[in-house]
Amino acid sequence: MNDEQRHQEWIAQRKAEEAKRRERAAECLKDHEYTVLADTDQLKAWRCKAPRTTCYAFDILITRFGIATVGDIDGLTFNVGLSYGIEFLAGDDIGYYIHSKLEEHCREREFDEDAFRAALVTGVCSQICQNTNDDEQYSSLPDWVRNDGGVGEAGRWEELIDLVDTRFATINYGEDGHDFWEKLDELLCEASDINYVEQASLFMSAHYDELGLGCDYWEITIDKPRDSLINRLYLINHAAKAIVAQQAEAKAA
């Protein structure tokens, strides 16, 4: 698989994840009804609830100064208000734009294993190229090792581990390159067990030079919005779309 194919695969995976979240939201709210609680120049409010149950029930409130959702999906507040309206919550860019308007304290984050591993793959490949002085050995390296890393490089993780294991196994103790490949092998083994942000940050801080991350390694983003938070945003988005559609029907009647 070449770089373009890998990039397209990454895009396809992202779209599949988004579709799965939309389907989940639709299933969770399939019986919901959307009732207007307030409709004034100062306040717009809706109750999003299925009959005879409070499961996934929540209210959406919009004032001049902000938007809030409260209820069975855990409360969230946004730093935009009536000028954006319910149409803002009904937008299509959920993971970036809608998320970007959350109040800071609502932006829950978690470890991004793919981003962490992608950074290591790119850095380690750079180190391998710089430390492979023999032209024949360099030519024998896979194309993906010699190319600059990019989106989807986390998918090379197992391939990189296999490559380093194989190269290290062919070099006897005391031979040229033994210490280099041994250290890479040890670091990749350690990195495979890392599963939270603080642990990854300490690891990168201690080994940024050996991993080829550069002195600005601290700028590498290794966390992402919490998965459960994004799922809640999809629930809110689904409800907002239903409310917008309901308003359009009322105007057309």
Sequence positions of predicted segments:
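N-terminal acidic, proline/glycine-rich, low-complexity intrinsically disordered segments
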Residues: 1-6
